Amino acid sequence: MNFSESERLQQLSNEYILGGVNSPSRSYKAVGGGAPVVMKEGHGAYLYDVDGNKFIDYLQAYGPIITGHAHPHITKAIQEQAAKGVLFGTPTELEIEFSKKLRDAIPSLEKIRFVNSGTEAVMTTIRVARAYTKRNKIIKFAGSYHGHSDLVLVAAGSGPSQLGSPDSAGVPESVAREVITVPFNDINAYKEAIEFWGDEIAAVLVEPIVGNFGMVMPQPGFLEEVNEISHNNGTLVIYDEVITAFRFHYGAAQDLLGVIPDLTAFGKIVGGGLPIGGYGGRQDIMEQVAPLGPAYQAGTMAGNPLSMKAGIALLEVLEQDGVYEKLDSLGQQLEEGLLKLIEKHNITATINRIYGSLTLYFTDEKVTHYDQVEHSDGEAFGKFFKLMLNQGINLAPSKFEAWFLTTEHTEEDIQQTLKAADYAFSQMK
């Protein structure tokens, strides 16, 4: 493929935009470098770049675009609302309608508040949990990404009894001292952290199904034990469902798994492609939030009518019969096809799939925790990424990310993807 216009625009971008991208995950640094492809438009399962190349898209904006690009029903809703006004700074009926649809789908959201991103949603749930418990420390799991606020950019200490250290420049040591990081799926490490820190722990922050070091399921009983241990300690359980809400079924992962948290953060999919975030949970906890309580959260754009209208339209598409069955079927076809090709070409790789989402890891062991992904073969992934890109298959440029299917992918897309993977694997020996 020819990428000359993307390369020209990237050089121009570097003159004005720091690093040439507005999010570091969009650069190709993790896959060997080079100018990232500059996209021009998207329709359904496909993206089209500035050089006229067409791609089958499995990036899907890192997860939000579950109904494909420019879905007619959502696009129409956005256009209709834009003609009426996009921001009023007042309550609207759309906020009420959208909140009701969300609570009908996710019953644990007894009360809801909207923000503008997943980062804001998680950041605020932590503040609310601290206000409710009157404690300061939180526990998070290694490898899970919860946005870029200071408190969650903290790396693990040497063990469950050790405090974390800043995972980014600009995060104060004083902030990192409020965070304990333990391995996902390691209930003994979690018990040790709770036993050591006791009544200092306000909340534990959990991705019920991990989406940020690929797709990783909790081990049987893990989430149930986290709930029990936490509540026995007076610690709140916060689920980060920014990726997982409405990804696997019409609702949240918590309902699919049958384990209910105290608070939930959500975003991505529910905005229909527009900026959104939100959080909710038990009424008695949520009543800590202003104007009813002392925990402050506000936002000029929070609950704006454009995002509310897009979210309502998105849920109207997803609540139709057969949507998630199709995603699961396509995911199964893609997984089975890739596994056959891995065997055919004797590639050291494994796959985690959860319904219509999967991750291909270049490692010889089944992935259940972050360290396995950290030590997987990033060089092999980078080569695979470039070989697929040059055949019109758009993946996330990182070994840690997932492939996302949409309602608009077809069996023909799967077959074309497998054909490209067959060639890519053949060039990796």
Curated annotation (Swiss-Prot):
Main location, first listed in the record: cytoplasm
Listed SUPFAM superfamilies: PLP-dependent transferases
One annotated Gene Ontology cellular component of this protein: cytoplasm
Swiss-Prot/TrEMBL catalytic activity: (S)-4-amino-5-oxopentanoate = 5-aminolevulinate
N6-(pyridoxal phosphate)lysine: residues bearing it: 268
Alphabetized UniProt keyword annotations: Cytoplasm, Isomerase, Porphyrin biosynthesis, Pyridoxal phosphate
PROSITE patterns (UniProt xref): AA_TRANSFER_CLASS_3 (PS00600)
Domain of life according to the entry: Bacteria
Biological or metabolic pathway of the protein: Porphyrin-containing compound metabolism; protoporphyrin-IX biosynthesis; 5-aminolevulinate from L-glutamyl-tRNA(Glu): step 2/2
Cofactor dependence: pyridoxal 5'-phosphate
Subcellular localization(s) per the UniProt record: Cytoplasm
GO biological process, one term: protoporphyrinogen IX biosynthetic process
UniProt-recorded Gene Ontology molecular function terms: glutamate-1-semialdehyde 2,1-aminomutase activity; pyridoxal phosphate binding; transaminase activity
Similarity remark: Belongs to the class-III pyridoxal-phosphate-dependent aminotransferase family. HemL subfamily.
Assembly notes: Homodimer.
Protein name (database record): Glutamate-1-semialdehyde 2,1-aminomutase 2
Organism: Staphylococcus aureus (strain MSSA476)
